[in-house]
C-alpha cells in the first residue's frame, strides 16, 4: 500500500471520529506501515489534503454546535414525565427545553393564596450569567411587582374592624335589649287590670315584697290566719329547716323566703322583749330597795 492510499484511509478514519492514537494502533494491528511520501506524492496530494481537511473541520464544527439530546427524543416536544406537563413548554427543536417560570409562579401563587393584579416581564440574557453563555439563548423570567396581599391578612383586618366597631358601640352608652331588667307589675296595677286571681296576687305580692324588703321598701302584710299559723309553729320550733319552711309556706300561700324572713324577725323581737323585761325587772328591784331605805330613815324611834 503506497503512501497515498494510506493517507486516504487515515483521513477517512479521522472523519469518522477516531483518535490519532487509535488510528496508529489500527495500522499497527494490520501490520501496515506508513511510508514517507515522495515529493511527487506530496505535490499530487496537496489538493486532496486541503479538501479533506476542510471537510473534517466543517464536520467537527457542526458536531460541536449541535446540542446533545436523546436520539429517541430528538424531535419530541413532550415533557419527560407526565407530572411535569405544566413545568415544560414546547420550544424549537434546536433549542434545549427551558422550564416555564410562568407556570411555576402561577402554581406557587395559587397555592399560597396570592391574587396578583399586574405582571412585569423582564428578559435576561444568559450571557450575563456566571455559568457562561448557553448558545446565546434568551430566557423569559416573569416577576411580580404588584401589591401582595394574603387572604388571611384581609380576614384579620376584617376581624379587627368588627372588634373596633363593637368597642365603639359599647363605649357609646347605648342600651341593648339584654341590659334591660324586666320587673313584675305592682299589686295595684294588677288589681286595676283584673287579670289575675287572688292566689296569683298573693304569690306575686309576696315575691315583690321580698324584693322591696331587701331594697328597703314596704313590708309584707300577713293575714290573721297566716300570723296564727306562724306563731303556732314558732311556739314549738324557733328554727326551721328548709323542708319544713316549704311545708308551711305551701298551705299559707307564701314563699319560702317570706317564711324565713318572718322567723328571723320573730326571733329578734323575742330577744328584744327579753332584754326589755330584764331591764324592767331590774328597775323594779332597784325601786323597792330605795323605798325600803326611805322607810327606814324616815321611821320615828320608839
Curated annotation (Swiss-Prot):
Chief localisation class: nucleus
A GO molecular-function descriptor: DNA-binding transcription factor activity, RNA polymerase II-specific
DNA-binding region: 215-274
Coiled-coil residue windows: none
Basic and acidic residues bias spans: 198-208
Signal peptide (residue range): none
Keywords: Developmental protein, DNA-binding, Homeobox, Nucleus, Transcription, Transcription regulation
Location in or out of the cell: Nucleus
Regions of compositional bias (Polar residues) in chain numbering: 214-224
A Gene Ontology term for the protein's cellular component: nucleus
Record region (Disordered): 198-224
Disulfide bonds, paired cysteine numbers: none
Single Gene Ontology BP annotation: regulation of transcription by RNA polymerase II
Job of this protein: Sequence-specific transcription factor which is part of a developmental regulatory system that provides cells with specific positional identities on the anterior-posterior axis.
Annotated PANTHER family: HOMEOBOX PROTEIN HOX-B1 (PTHR45946:SF5), HOMEOBOX PROTEIN ROUGH-RELATED (PTHR45946)
Protein name: Homeobox protein Hox-C1a
